[in-house]
Amino acid sequence: MSENTTATTRARRKVREGLVVSDKMDKTVVVEVEDRVKHGLYGKIMRRTSKLKVHDEQNSAGIGDRVLIMETRPLSATKRWRLVEILEKAK
């Protein structure tokens, strides 16, 4: 009788790059992420943006910063992303 062992592997987490548009909340920033989508019928490439609430533990990001974010477990009713690093500070 062989014991069936399965190694549980964690799924790859989504990583996005975006621009901070609000830092008024404590330990939270709002990041606007751009996605380019091709129209199904006409083929035109369109820009779609979505605003995501991101957990910023040290309150280090400010408005205008370009940041790298990663998907995580739900931290609140609307927060499912966390700040990985600040790629470029605002001028």
UniProtKB/Swiss-Prot annotation:
**SUPFAM superfamilies with a match to the protein in the record:** Nucleic acid-binding proteins
- What are the alphabetically sorted keywords of the record? Ribonucleoprotein, Ribosomal protein, RNA-binding, rRNA-binding
Subunit structure and binding partners: Part of the 30S ribosomal subunit.
- Name of the protein: Small ribosomal subunit protein uS17
Q: Which GO terms describe its cellular component?
A: cytosolic small ribosomal subunit
GO BP terms, alphabetized: translation
UniProt record similarity statement: Belongs to the universal ribosomal protein uS17 family.
Protein's job: One of the primary rRNA binding proteins, it binds specifically to the 5'-end of 16S ribosomal RNA.
State any single GO MF term: rRNA binding
Which Pfam families does the UniProt entry name for this protein? Ribosomal_S17
